[in-house]
Amino acid sequence: RNKSINILYQEFIKIMKQYFTKQENNKSLILFFTGWGMDQNTLSINKKDFDTCICFDYTDIDFEKSHYKNYQAIDVYGWSMGVWAASYTLQNCNLPIRKSVAINGTIFPIEKERGIDPIIFQKTIDLLNEQSLLKFNKRMCGSKENFQFFIKHSSLRSIESLKQELISIQSMVKKDMTSTFQWDKAIIGTRDFIFPTKNQLKAWRKIKYEIIDEAHFLDFNKYVD
């Protein structure tokens, strides 16, 4: 592996994984908080004049902000559970954030009305195995074509790693980890069966939002602008 790109990706460190997929000494950065169970393979964003860093694995929510000290502008994107993770970790970071966009997620990740139903979340933990994960991923993608796209970029993490991440998220959310972080815009998919569309609409009533004809998982390049 190229150490200049992968220096932040160290499995043995108890910290949120932060992985540069593009690091070319640009002055602007796309900081993307991806969803549960994902890793650096989940998405590939290559925007001109921007470096790209992918955040994932919220088993530990500690965040190393010093890696971003040389950037003049940071565009934050959160997808799915990454919306909550970004909200919590960035609220006191004092980074030069230019804009923030939430995609198919909310700041209330485990909540019946504005997030994922707590009963469904618990069942996901209790029943998690290879078969149930496959079912979840198909539901997340919504169509055969989208699923085929997803599996080309799917996570290489173990089932046990994914389960521990869910348990940790559940524990942290129960502590009422509220945030003062402000999102500029929410993007809401009409075919999202993970964070139900109606729940997202309830969660984002007070900010600008865009409704799109997409499933929970999508081609993120279309919405990184």
Regions found by a protein language model. Give the residues of each.
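Short beta-strand/loop motif that positions the catalytic acidic residue
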Residues: A186-I188
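Catalytic histidine-centered segment of alpha/beta-hydrolase-like enzymes
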Residues: E214-V224
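Conserved alpha/beta-hydrolase "acid-adjacent" motif
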Residues: F193-N199
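Gly/Ala-rich beta-loop-alpha elbow adjacent to hydrolase catalytic centers
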Residues: G78-G82, A86
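Flexible "cap/lid" loop of the alpha/beta hydrolase fold
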Residues: I97-L127
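Acidic beta-to-alpha connecting loop that harbors the catalytic carboxylate
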Residues: T190-D192, E214-A215
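Conserved HGGG/HGGXW glycine-rich cap/lid loop of the alpha/beta-hydrolase fold
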Residues: M16-D62
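Conserved alpha/beta-hydrolase catalytic His-Asp/Glu region
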Residues: E130-Q170
